[in-house]
Structure formats: structure tokens, C-alpha cells
Amino acid sequence: MADMSNGEQGCGSPLELFHSIAAQGELVRDLKARNAAKDEIDSAVKMLLSLKTSYKAATGEDYKVDCPPGDPAPESGEGLDATEADEDFVDPWTVQTSSAKGIDYDKLIVRFGSSKIDKELVNRIERATGQRPHRFLRRGIFFSHRDMHQILDAYENKKPFYLYTGRGPSSEAMHVGHLIPFIFTKWLQDVFNVPLVIQMTDDEKYLWKDLTLDQAYGYAVENAKDIIACGFDINKTFIFSDLDYMGMSPGFYKNVVKIQKHVTFNQVKGIFGFTDSDCIGKISFPAIQAAPSFSNSFPQIFRDRTDVQCLIPCAIDQDPYFRMTRDVAPRIGYPKPALLHSTFFPALQGAQTKMSASDPNSSIFLTDTAKQIKTKVNKHAFSGGRDTVEEHRQFGGNCDVDVSFMYLTFFLEDDDKLEQIRRDYTSGAMLTGELKKELIEVLQPLIAEHQARRKEVTDEIVKEFMTPRKLSYDFQ
């Protein structure tokens, strides 16, 4: 563990804090470049955010690169990165914020240049599909998009599109946060009646983690069982392992090479923070995640068509991959993929970071028993309640920081009941223990039902989902 003792006590003046933030930012980048342990990186990021919070408290201003306290701020955002521009740190591997409310998603929309999913777009989706919008849309869990109106234009004009999402299989067991994109993607598949490709990036996990190729592929197959248990239509869904599919699909590999030719090393360093010490596999991997965005990567499904647009539901931290993809697409003659971005599923300890499979106490796993779920929620779920019952009754709880309430916004279908819980908890009529009980009563059957469905997923079913084949959709 790196020595962080120079962080909070040793830096009194704003100028000392300024230099400490710069040094801590360099440490974070160095740890990521050296592939340090996740807990070491997380600890360094937390210290960085703490220093920035102290700096803002001391100066009344956000920390800005190359702008010591007392100097005027730069006129443009040039030179600012995600670590230094504000208090949120978001990339495909790390999500941290100093705010107990979680990431400021409005700022993230501005930073990433995407568009907010507003009421007008939600209503248009409802009109186009004839279905009530999913609770993830109604509640702003999927909050941002790129070109969703184009997808709806295509759908309304009887033009085809397809869905693409994925999973990085880093462990055998998935947690409930991993379900979010798949729950929503299943709904999209159902209401639009379109085919879906699901990429298992076992090659990525081999490159980033201390895994053998066989372990990475094994995790992909095991994770595929959990994904299949979400209820996807076997006649309209193709799940593929990169390690498996790349060697049997010339069309897929040709698109990977096209993308690689049109993205420079300097660009991927700028987008993903790669350094000269990263292996060349990492440098080239973004092209592999980009390739499923183009329909002719799957000739068994789309034949030789290159004009079928793709819609990608994913968490917002994956957007850098697809900003790169959208930049390349017109240069190689393909339509840009559209995207729907979700918020992060918070860790049990609070919304400052997302749930992680590497920390068993921060996660509710899909393999957990009813007893384990109850214990984890009661023991670890961060509360927005007051210190005493008397104070809570008088002042009420804070739903904006309460993890149990956050989880209910993801998994409780009944809007009226959710609103009643919010009112009761905010007013003090409902105590923290009662709120946690509500969550436990939602999570226990949800996970038990998932486990029952997963038991029905045989090796033969997995093989069928993962076999390249024509899907039940006519693209002529």
C-alpha cells in the first residue's frame, strides 16, 4: 500500500493542498499504469478526492490544473482531465466521487457530450412501442443517450436495428449490479422485437487481470448462464466469447483491423489513459469492443449488410469505447452506434463508488442465500437515517444518500409504493431498520428466482446461445 500520510494532516495552506493534489493525481496514474491492486488504486483515488474536497473548503473554488490558488482560471478546459476537473472520477475501470449522493450525472453528460433522456424521449419510446416505459427509464436510471431518436426513426419507418451489450467476466459469480444492463436490454428486446448480440470480453480480463486464458473463458461461460437466466429469447440472441469467436469469424476480425488502422496510439492514450508500460494487448483491445457495433461483424445474422444500426445499452463508464467507435464509424463506411447510458449501481457502503465483485462486503451476489442478503443489508448498507430514533422521528431520513432506498429505485416495480416509502422515510415515520426490511423483502425473492432460472440453464442451452447461427429475424 502506498504511503498516503501526507494527505490530510500535512497540508495546511491552499498552495500546499494544490501541490499535494497534483502529486496524488500522478500517484493515481502511476498505480493504474503499473496495474496495481484495485484496493490500492481505490485508496489513492479516495485520498485524491479528499484532498480536492479540502482544497475547495479552503479556497471556495474547485481545483484546476495549472491554476494555483489566487491565479485566474484558464479560459478553456484545455489541460483538465476527469481526475482534476471536478470531484468525480469516471473511466472504464474506476468510479469514485466524494459526494454521498453519488456521481453528478448532469455534469457527466456535459463532460461526455451526450444528451439527457428527457420526458419527451421517454414518451416517444412509449408511443413507438405501445408499452409502458421500463422503471429504469421512468426513474432516470438510464439517463443519457446518443442518437436514440435515430433508432426510433428507423423503428417507426420499419427499418431494422439490433442491440449490443456485453460483460467483462472477471469472476465466476456476478452481483446484482451486473444485472442492470441485462434487465433493461431484455426489455428492449421484448418491446422492439429485435436481435441481440452479447460480447463476453474474456480477452480483456485476461489482459487486465491475473488470469489464465482457460480461467477467463470459464468465467465467460459461467457468466453466460446468469445472463441467459435473465430471460433472453434464444431465437434472437447470440452470446459470444471474444477468445472463441475471433478465430472463427473473418468478418469480425476484418472490422477489428479496420478500426485499429483508424485510431492512433496517441488517441487511445488520451481516451483511456494508457501509458508506455501497458502491454500492446490493452492498446489494441478497444477495437475489439468496438467491432460488434457494426452489423457485418456477424455475417451469420446480417449476411453482408453494413447498414444495420446498432443500439448499445451500457453503464456510462463504457462510453469512452463508443465515443471512439462513433468517431471511426463514418471513416470506414458504417453507421454510428446509438447508446443508452445507465447510472452506476452503488456499493453497499455508499454511492461514492460502484458495487464491485472484488469486495464481498460491498456486493450482493447472485449466489447469496436469503440469510446472507439479510445480513449484508442490515450490516453494511449505508443509511441516510439519523443517529437516534428521536432525531430520526423529528428530522427524518435522507433518501438521497440512503443505499437501501437507492436499491429500491432499481428493483421495486411499484411506483406508488416507492413514493410512499420515500415520503415515510423522509418524514421520519419509517425508521432505517424498516426501510432495510423493505429492501430485503424485494431482494430475497428476486435473487432466489434468478437462482432457480439459472439452474435450468444447461450446458446444451449455453452452447446453443453461443453458437454462431442465423437468428429469427429477416433483414432483407
Curated annotation (Swiss-Prot):
A biological process term (GO) from this entry: positive regulation of gene expression
Subcellular location: Cytoplasm
Region (Dispensable to the catalytic activity): 1-117
Catalytic activity reported: tRNA(Trp) + L-tryptophan + ATP = L-tryptophyl-tRNA(Trp) + AMP + diphosphate + H(+)
Domain WHEP-TRS: 13-69
PTM sites of type N6-succinyllysine: K159
Gene3D superfamilies: HUPs, S15/NS1, RNA-binding, Tyrosyl-Transfer RNA Synthetase
Entry GO MF terms: ATP binding; kinase inhibitor activity; protein domain specific binding; protein homodimerization activity; protein kinase binding; tryptophan-tRNA ligase activity
GO cellular component terms, semicolon-separated: cytoplasm; cytosol; nucleus; protein-containing complex
Residue interval(s) of motif 'KMSKS' region: 354-358
PTM (free text): Proteolytic cleavage generates 2 forms; T1-TrpRS and T2-TrpRS.
Motif extent ('HIGH' region): 169-178
Coiled coil: none
EC main group: ligase
Keyword Cell membrane in annotation: no
Name listed for the protein in its UniProt record: Tryptophan--tRNA ligase, cytoplasmic
Protein species of origin: Bos taurus
GN (gene name): WARS1
